């Protein structure tokens, strides 16, 4: 796998993708066997992160000139679904941390060079909610504050942190993402005590007066206008995919994967299960069968939508076409709906799985708790995305761009 990540142009992209997925498949038994350990530890074990790194997970969408693979997002997302089917927490960290190189490719070249020139395996966590304080200073910005829910931060040398630059003589207020090195932030190890996604280590990070040069910032205004400075060196259509939708899908695929894992656990538990009161195997009970059929259908549909959407989006851009606004908001809604449908389907399985469901070491209940945690991410806001999608179909004008918000379609 290492040879695939050396920045050379792939001679057989399909073969490269198959190798990537095969490397992930080889890791799944170990990831699955240690899902309980991951949750108890409160973060993904170091050796699992090392194995994911060797498999190319954290270079999958990284620019080739910095040692990345630039795999199609449809392939990357399929890999993340598979990882999450073994462990929801590991899948979440792999997906979120794994997609950050794609956004970092939109930063100025100087930032990319600083991160990857000496270490192509450098990783970044994130916390985009603008909870910190920032002000302009000579050559850049002064950044301070506390950011929550920085998934996988224990394994990262950088953090992508959101803040709103206040209006001043140089311009109006605007949202930016700040790329902060590990030396400039602290991790609050007591900030992650949760009932779902416990193994993600989504801890608070604290910055006390870091100086961030301008080149280590990413402006939402550039996302809106398609003027990201990274396009100067990463000019392929691949990097012009809609960042908001890239991230929304990044959050959805661990939910799809966790639901896959829950379905697999349900099938394994009920194939041979017999009621303590006697009678035929529970597998012959329609009450056990019907929720399974629903869950299988919901998971397959969500998985198929991810594959079809991102194959279509990339094909459009490579053909020199725009992605219509209606298709963008449709994607936003479908990714939020994946959370809703997968969580609901797994909940239905819980109700007919018997008392063993609530054992603390049970995979099914762990997947469900992880799904509930994922369902509370802002990217899973079904009402917001449904409104946007329905308005587009009804001919309602889209809302105006707001430079202080992160939502750009």
Model segments located where?
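DPxDG-like acidic metal-binding loop motif
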Residues: 146-192, 201, 354
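Glycine-rich beta->alpha junctions and the first turn(s) of the following alpha-helix
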Residues: 195, 202-299
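Generic structural signal for well-ordered, non-transmembrane alpha-helical segments
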Residues: 257, 293-300, 332, 336-343, ...
